[in-house]
């Protein structure tokens, strides 16, 4: 029986993971679960999976969680970091944003063998520091993002003579919008993704294509491949998740339905494969289309290459991620327009002046903190409130 933990169990990926685990109780013993604020769902999940530990990040909800778990033996902590130290065979980390970095580092130190990682920000911002620590501790990182999971599976079979890797992007809900239409995008439209069911933040990132910018940086770090060998193409059907092109001209691609249960299941069971109901039928799919991204309407992609080709790629990765988290949050509150999201990110990157060597988690946190201050100032002073 595998011992597992799920950090961020009440988000979209976390809920999918819990659903899979609930159907495979004979295979997995759930040691720990964590959530930011959804104490009611966390308590339900803990009872469903017979979890030994739970953690809530919002300490104001500790009493509510405790009351919800009365009559059980579940131990309660505050903050995912406090249960990330529990050694397990596999830890699923599905916390959203930079908040996941600390817990990931703790999981690496805990003696856990495998991390199934849905938190791309950890790889984007943690970079070499995180991956070096994982290598020292002999911790395998399996990405859950469908694109990186696809590339991971292909490279597991053959990582020699790679010419390039191709990440596919759905293009989001505004793929065919004009610039004028993009200026008037409302929040509810940005949250309506055509092919994936995701949380608010990643839905907006997909709409701006900032998600793909972050994924390019993630791919560079995770697969140790140079930026000029990473390409992103638009594939609206989201059936082809990743492609690896080899020097002899052969291309290996992973095709699957748009269901996060598929990469999650692989991460849980790999290298074995567990049966799932959703199977791809290409005859019913009809056509698969591919196109170049439009950088004028979706300039976020260029920022990823600017970051990776800069003199301080890790610092700039942290700045980009922090500014984007601030800008997306302001958009979700309808304080700035859709096109202003990338503008805030770009302005923050231009305004950030102090570049330091990154030798610790504290260095990353400090850069992230300073970037957020700059991004907030840019929002307040340069961006007209959206209405």
UniProtKB/Swiss-Prot annotation:
Binding positions (Mn(2+)): 145, 147, 215
GO biological process, one term: isopentenyl diphosphate biosynthetic process, methylerythritol 4-phosphate pathway involved in terpenoid biosynthetic process
Catalytic activity: 2-C-methyl-D-erythritol 4-phosphate + NADP(+) = 1-deoxy-D-xylulose 5-phosphate + NADPH + H(+)
Any Pfam family hit: DXP_reductoisom
Keywords: Isoprene biosynthesis, Manganese, Metal-binding, NADP, Oxidoreductase
EC number, as in UniProt: 1.1.1.267
Pathway assignment: Isoprenoid biosynthesis; isopentenyl diphosphate biosynthesis via DXP pathway; isopentenyl diphosphate from 1-deoxy-D-xylulose 5-phosphate: step 1/6
GO terms for MF: 1-deoxy-D-xylulose-5-phosphate reductoisomerase activity; manganese ion binding; NADPH binding
Cofactor: Mg(2+); Mn(2+)
Enzyme class: oxidoreductase
Recorded superkingdom: Bacteria
Amino acids binding NADPH: 10-13, 38, 119, 121, 199
Chain positions recorded as 1-deoxy-D-xylulose 5-phosphate binding sites: 120, 146-147, 170, 193, 206, 211-212, 215
Reported function: Catalyzes the NADPH-dependent rearrangement and reduction of 1-deoxy-D-xylulose-5-phosphate (DXP) to 2-C-methyl-D-erythritol 4-phosphate (MEP).
Similarity comment: family membership: Belongs to the DXR family.
Protein name: 1-deoxy-D-xylulose 5-phosphate reductoisomerase
Lineage: Bacteria, Pseudomonadati, Pseudomonadota, Alphaproteobacteria, Rickettsiales
